Amino acid sequence: MAPSKARSSPAVERRDRLTLAKLASYDDVATDALVDRAYFWTNTRKNRTKYIPVRGIMDDKVAEILLHHVIVAKDTVKAERELLAISGIKKYMAKLPSDREKEWFRRHLRKYIQMYLPDCPFEVTTTNRYTITEHEAAICARKFIKQGQEIKYLSGTLVPMTREEEQDLDLKRKDFSIVMSSRRKTPSFFLGPARFANHDCDANGRLVTRGSEGMQVVATRDIEIGEEITVSYGEDYFGIDNCECLCLTCERAVRNGWAPQVDSEASSTASTPALNDETKSAHGSTSPQKRKYAPDADSDASASPTPQKRRKFSRQYSKLRTEVSLSGDVTAIEPDPEQNTKIAVETTTDVPKDKPATNGVTENESNARVSENQRATSDREPSSPLGVDESQNSSASTAPTSLFDVGIKLEESTEAFTQETLTTTKAGSVADSHGDGDCRQLTAGIEQEALSELSESLELDDKSGTVVKRRKRRTRRQVVPSVEDESHRVRVPGDYTKTSKLLAQSYDRWVECRTCKTWFLQHNSYLTRRECPRCERHSMLYGFQWPKTDKDGPLDDEERVMDHRTVHRFLYPEEEARISRRDRGVSFGVTPTPELSEPRTETEDSEACDERRNTRASRRRTQSLRMTM
């Protein structure tokens, strides 16, 4: 029989397939080179926590390759070859072990190169709607997109995930690109340009699969120029029914995460169960989570609701160990020779006597013998240092671990107990020391482990072998950093734009873009910039004013600016004189979001100050809102 053809082992196939770690590494380098180093005003979120930017990648070099080979010549193959020749990317490619991995990296890099083609209908921008102090990546349309049209170049790569990889991403808060495959019913990790699309309850895009490893975005309705391209992450992704969602649709409707908080709810937060960790909103101060699939049924059954704020853990001791304080000063009490002190011992264990106890001895008899020994000792020593209080026997179900757990308060005394009685072999007995050295056994049957379970106010002195008061040790209180999320701050629609919370320095100011008419924060605004970072970056890359990327036709005589350094990026002195620096652009009481603001009319005379830039209706609305604050 001819031998069958040898198949490759599963280990080799597993080693050759595209894994999550490999795809995450490719995406980090690609976004670092083609997004962050292409005149981008911030750094995009990386998949690896300890990612170090690749050295040897210069912004001017990347922008030159994109301008000449991608934007003007529309030759992505040559642009890819030029980018791979950059020293930083070349060193990274040399570290890849196999040719197959190098091909995977080139294929993923090509997706980001195609974003800069003139016919690409979108571009990467940022928004601080979800986290006010940090800008998250977003996708903005720069061309009109029809309903049902597949958004060109807005794609990504899918890679299957294991359960261990999924849990690791949850711990690192990097689970913002997890999608659930409707066909295979397994989680997959999704990376590429389309991963920058944010969630919206009324999304204008939809994620669809293309092949086994591809993902594309299709427009579900008409998308206008300047509108953010969004997709839906799921019905219960940001809490139950997305109750913590901070999308633009919820902001306009003032619902979910934008809903006003009622005072009665604030007082009952301690008794109100909070959502599970997996359903917490990613739009808060922590890292955003995106496209996270709904948890399994078994995980929901095991999870229990936790309070909004976890109470500080405190160890609760049994009441049997608590001391019963005597009335008055214990040291001032003189023992009455006519009335002897009684000690009631509650125990459920057999107490051995001087002679070995038989099986017929009951628990009551053993307790009676112990009481007789204690009474005889008390009669012989009227001036015993023990000051005790009468106590009654409780039920047999309550078993203290020590004689000192029943309310005995001891004073410091070197005559209390001797070292000899503490070194018994199996059962330790507590003996009372007499003046002439005569020791009589007080109790027996308490094992040696019980000696370590003394009352909290007592301890064993190793030198003298006596039980003395425990000295209070001075402990330095250390502040333990909290691992819990802070309580969610109440969000108000438009609180992320024209707010004073982002004005960290004296010359920081909110400025209105002269191109797209949106407000942006300019740091150190000694001279006012003409355009926002998005429009300025577009002009530096394409040589045209946003959103234009190429000539409209043969009749278009506007020339492309090949050197962005020749463009004046600030306002001229006569324009600067008409700008009011009052309040540094901060808005009080008016929602400054462009989509929510009322339409306004502008004239040449209305540019004297910011207050005159609104219509009469807007001024009336401003006054009414200020009166209600």
UniProtKB/Swiss-Prot annotation:
Record's catalysed reaction(s): L-lysyl(20)-[histone H4] + 3 S-adenosyl-L-methionine = N(6),N(6),N(6)-trimethyl-L-lysyl(20)-[histone H4] + 3 S-adenosyl-L-homocysteine + 3 H(+)
GO cellular component: chromosome; nucleus
Basic and acidic residues compositional bias, start-end: 597-614
Protein name per Swiss-Prot or TrEMBL: Histone-lysine N-methyltransferase set9
EC category name: transferase
GO molecular function, one term: histone H4K20 trimethyltransferase activity
Organism ancestry: Eukaryota, Fungi, Dikarya, Ascomycota, Pezizomycotina
GO biological process, one term: methylation
Signal sequence, renumbered to the chain: none
Coiled coil spans: none
Region of interest: Disordered: 264-400, 586-629
Biased composition (Polar residues): 264-274, 338-350, 359-376, 390-400
Described purpose of this protein according to its UniProt entry: Histone methyltransferase that trimethylates 'Lys-20' of histone H4 to form H4K20me3.
Alphabetized CDD domains for the sequence: SET_Suv4-20-like
InterPro entries xrefs: Hist-Lys_N-MTase_N (IPR041938), Set9_fungi (IPR025783), SET_dom (IPR001214), SET_dom_sf (IPR046341), Suv4-20/Set9 (IPR039977)
Gene3D superfamilies per UniProt: Histone-lysine N-methyltransferase (1.10.10.1700), SET domain (2.170.270.10)
Subcellular compartments: Nucleus; Chromosome
Residue intervals of the SET domain: 120-234
Similarity annotation: Belongs to the class V-like SAM-binding methyltransferase superfamily. Histone-lysine methyltransferase family. Suvar4-20 subfamily.
